[in-house]
């Protein structure tokens, strides 16, 4: 059971891969009377503090809500991939000039989860605008919750959504058979020649990422009280619900931009077919500044009886990667069903037929308008067929902070000729160094940087970047710049602790790697574990991934595949999607961790480059290679044995010697580090070079022997005299 509400990606076998992609237009059929609420109940969510065995993993929140005659405990956690961190919102001036603003969207106020003791429940909340707003689905019933504005006691209203099927009569699709045939004939030839079907072995991936742009027409804007902030809040709510519906397909729906037609519609709204056609042409030019996978238009038009329309399998194929969703003014959860349905068409899904099933009375791609939250086996098959053939734009997770960033004064990023950029008006009012026009205030020398303090350059020799480990090196300010020198570290291949070698600022070894995953008592497993597991070529043991194939490790490279551990005392608490494996080999229990295709998170189980794999050998790119492959232009002799080579092959001198070659007296550092401070005192090298270690050891042993010799005769004599 998904105890903590973790959404399980249902894997449905794709029975048939069709050649070509059928493209047509599919209308979400005509609506009947609008949905109605029951009378709302007033509830006050109370935070639940879990302790002991009932405590949730970090990141989970729990609230108790009493409605419908009983108490419900909601468990939820933050969604991280939903809205771009700097969301571009486009509106229009009175003279129809386009304005762009970038909202800073908090990444900790969109939640999803479940209701305790309610199997198949769903919770989708936002808390960005004061209180909880969203949807709860419990035992086949749907509820919407919203905060009571300005309530001093955190009061909310909970509405039960009527789900009587008589309110949802059969709906007619907007296409005739003749139109379907025409669309198929028009697009089939070009599509078949353009597509290159992918391997059937790649039909399941861990995650897809659909970057969505939403355009809101003027009637929708009027319905949202002609308030741009209210429009944004409504759009966020709908996308949040839709995203939760698509989790079962392993798909993230990520909002990357909104355009609001606040001054009137850009083109007429006469029929749903005309709106879709005009929208697909308009967006090709007007949304070109936003790289997106799909664009959907939210309209509100009671004169258009069709709820939605989209090009089937238009994903990744501009300009037909779009759809239109018609809000009927009923409930946001039902409108989210419409959006999920039309987005399903964009992703290649057809309407469900008699042999399609999802385990519920109503399914998302049903031709009947009923509350639904699941896709059928037919929808899975259509989705996988489309994404296999043309879903390349869905493969890569977006960098949410970099989706859209106009270069301009006021975006908080120093660009071009700007001296500084303090961001918004409110931020600039609190900035002592930077003005609103991106110039420095009078008397200020700087406004940011590791070597800027109180609008002044920090003095020469001031430490600005402390070394973080034995393979790192410090940097100091030069007194004339706000920037700390570029981060430098010890040259690759220089020995570090535990008979390891520094590599790219790290001192890696298998034992330490095992301790990081399994705790302080764990250690690297025997050679038999590495040979047996890493030669299998599966997600628990391999030497890399080529496309969709796990590569078996050659016998000489088994220590460079996946780390294998033993002496494991505790099972670690890991991120979602990781799986632990323990295998008994020759009386030893070998522990490892998996990594499968397109997890899109850091692989903590792969052996890190630079890890020792044999005498004088290290792992690089899953191969066990000789240390000689590393370029050692700089040697200890280069630094006169008084310093260490850095990653630029320059000498970083010990205290008492000056760069570049540590020949003359000075305060240490390198030509890259900035001038070292004269106040550091005695220099203690970060790297224990073996020769120095031996000298230290011999000195210590000699000293002990000397002391023992000095004290020995006295003890012997005293013992003899007794």
Swiss-Prot record:
It is found in: Membrane. May be involved in sperm maturation and/or fertilization. May also be involved in epithelia functions associated with establishing and maintaining gradients of ions or nutrients. InterPro entries: ADAM_Cys-rich, Disintegrin_CS, Disintegrin_dom, Disintegrin_dom_sf, EGF-like_dom, MetalloPept_cat_dom_sf, Peptidase_M12B, Peptidase_M12B_N. It holds the Pfam family Pep_M12B_propep. Its main location: membrane. Residues 634-663 form the EGF-like domain. It comes from the Eukaryota. Disulfide bonds join 316-393, 356-378, 358-363, 464-484, 634-645, 639-651, 653-662. One of its GO terms (molecular function) is metallopeptidase activity. PANTHER family: ADAM A DISINTEGRIN AND METALLOPROTEASE DOMAIN, DISINTEGRIN AND METALLOPROTEINASE DOMAIN-CONTAINING PROTEIN 21. SUPFAM superfamilies: Blood coagulation inhibitor (disintegrin) (SSF57552), Metalloproteases ('zincins'), catalytic domain (SSF55486). May be the functional equivalent of ADAM 1/fertilin alpha which is a pseudogene in human. The gene is ADAM21. Keywords: Disulfide bond, EGF-like domain, Glycoprotein, Hydrolase, Membrane, Metal-binding, Metalloprotease, Protease, Signal, Transmembrane, Transmembrane helix, Zinc, Zymogen. It comes from Homo sapiens (Human). Binds 1 zinc ion per subunit. One of its GO terms (biological process) is male gonad development. PROSITE patterns: ADAM_MEPRO (PS50215), DISINTEGRIN_1 (PS00427), DISINTEGRIN_2 (PS50214), EGF_2 (PS01186), ZINC_PROTEASE (PS00142). The chain crosses the membrane at residues 682-702. One of its GO terms (cellular component) is plasma membrane. Its cofactor is Zn(2+). Residues 208-398 form the Peptidase M12B domain. This is Disintegrin and metalloproteinase domain-containing protein 21. Residues 197-681 are extracellular. Residues 32-196 form a propeptide. Glycans are attached at residues 164, 227, 377, 437, 478, 546, 600. Its EC number is 3.4.24.-.
